[in-house]
Amino acid sequence: MKNKPEDHQPRVVLMIALASVVLVLFLLRLVYLQVIEGNHYLEQADNTTSYRFNITAARGEIVDCYGRSLATNTTGYNLVMNNLMLGDNDLNDTLKTLVEILQTSGDSWNDATPISSPDADGHYSFTDGDNTSDQNRLAAIKTNLGLQQYATADEVMSAIVAKYELENYEPAWQRILGGIRCQMTSEDYSNYTNFTLATGISDRTVATVKERSLSLAGAEIVETSMRSYPDGTVLPHVLGSVGKILREQWVADDYALRRKGYAMNDLIGRSGLEAVYEDRLRGQDGSLQVVKDSDGVIQSSQVVEKPQPGQTVMLTVDADFQKEVQAALENRILTLQQTKPAHSGQEANAGAVVVLDVKTGGILATATYPTYDLNQYSATYSDLAAQDPSPLLNRAFNGLYTPGSSFKPAVAAAGLLNGVITPTSTVNCVNPYVYYDYRPTCLQHGHSGPIAVSDALKYSCNIFFYDTGVRTGLETYNAMAQRLGLAVQTGVEVGESTGWLTTPQDENFTSSLIVQAAIGQANTMVTPVQLATYAATIANKGVRYRTHMVAGFRDTNTGEILETVDPVVEDTIVDNVGAFDAIEQGMIGAAKYTSATSNYPYTIAVKTGSPQRAETYGTGRGRANYNNGVIVAYGPVEDPQIAIAAVVEWSGGGSNIAQIAVDVFNAYFFDQSNSLNSQAAGTLLP
């Protein structure tokens, strides 16, 4: 028998009632959430924090006159700590694990804390020594720890252990982790600032950290642009170096670097062109925005500003020619060491060569010996700093040398242009020259008796220049020397020593120094780059260009030339008496009279010098001074292209280093098959 429809009615009513109750409860809950607690949950939903991180721009390149890279960038990897990603991981334990990975791979880590590892008794010592940066760093650490500046190393380490909760680690690990934590503090590690634990890490470290990423929260492998030098032996002193910002740089001028957009762990040019053109090379950093909610969950991450690479700095230097000039200098020094007797060049051990484009003042090459490999600079700095003679000194721009007889053309120019002598007037070369009670002599090589200026330069007659110098006057020939380029700033971009001339204000001045200074002795000290500028000015018949090595700047992205550096005339000496012609004839004669340059296929102009050093050898009547060697040269005389200056310490005299000039001329004028170069060094290819 079938049920009647009315038998189902109670069930339907019950279901409707239950559904109504559920609906009412849902609506009440919705009202509660939306109306009563709405503001609370709205605030919670909006409780996110936005963080911005720098994306470092690629550094601009430095290239030679043909566009060949001298300083460039390669892709590398850094190990970075990101506090946003650390989560609940213990920072100290994470750092310990990462250091163990770095140690296994032979990688170093970022810790400049000047405190030693514990000794056998568990004591520590400071390692700051005479290093100002380390001393400043140590002072900052003590201040941060609330210690007095006289606190001992043990007291500092105790404070570090307490502050960074390192009590449960062994002493060796307390030092390692404490040093890293101090470094992190000094670099403002926080949710807003990442910390670079290690730079340029090995592939092994990269792989290991990635494999263990789940247990190493907060540790990130970051691809980065790293500075590299295709041939680190080319222009190391000039290119300079980059390094992390030092704390004293960071706090200087009320944190000026921060206002310019730097982060404390950024790289910055430390020396050379890298420092001088930091603003052009650095580029514009980009920006990464990370949004994190109140539970610490990353909600979004996006690049909001793309980084823009720095500009390319173009030089006047020809990298291949530079290598040949460097080789010419080194080979000559080694040859002198191996072939010359003691006291006559065997002791040669250091020097410099500078080669200029006569028509522009652009530096085509600048070599210093001894030198170093820029790619190994950081790793070998301590050894380099301890060597004598120092490879770190840029002798071409900062080495100060007595010019000796290479100074005589300046005295000749002063005498001729001031009417004290003429191209044909003579001085009687008879020993000794008498100036009050001072009686210097002349070696009289190849001459004696009456001699005019051109032959006096050819044979390097001392008495001619004693007399001309005295009659012209110290101040007058000094002024001429400076107009020609000696003992003044030449204009080279990376910094240079000014040097000095002998003056009446010198503490040791006596009237005899007027005589000695006229042959480039006394107190006069100049640099090789000044000597090259001086030679170029003589080649240009009195027109002195500003010496420079930067040719211009180029947009790295588009290749567009942004700026070119045009030749600048610094001085023009008016010559209505044929002074520079007479000087040139004398220097041509000197080239013919010097064995190494006597048969050169082009007509070249040369003046050597053999300035005496203060050091002596021998005893009694056999006592004598050691000599440096100096040479200035230019050529071809008919249409001068390049000017050369070379100085070699302890080389025994200018004639001993004249081969350097020959080798440099050969490298410029001829290719390796001894054929005439169709493309001269320093000439941009079309």
Sequence positions of predicted segments:
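Solvent-exposed, polar/charged alpha-helical surfaces in well-ordered, non-transmembrane soluble domains
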Residues: 89-100, 199, 207, 211, ...
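A short acidic/glycine-rich loop-to-helix N-cap element
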Residues: 651-660
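A generic structural motif
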Residues: 84-85, 648-652
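Membrane-proximal periplasmic segments of bacterial cell-envelope enzymes
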Residues: 1-306, 339-352, 358
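Beta-lactamase-like hydrolase cores
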Residues: 323-355, 371
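Short, gly/Ser/Thr-rich active-site loops of penicillin-recognizing serine hydrolases
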Residues: 561, 662-686
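Beta-lactam-recognizing serine transpeptidase/beta-lactamase-like catalytic domain environment
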Residues: 71, 77, 291-310, 317, ...
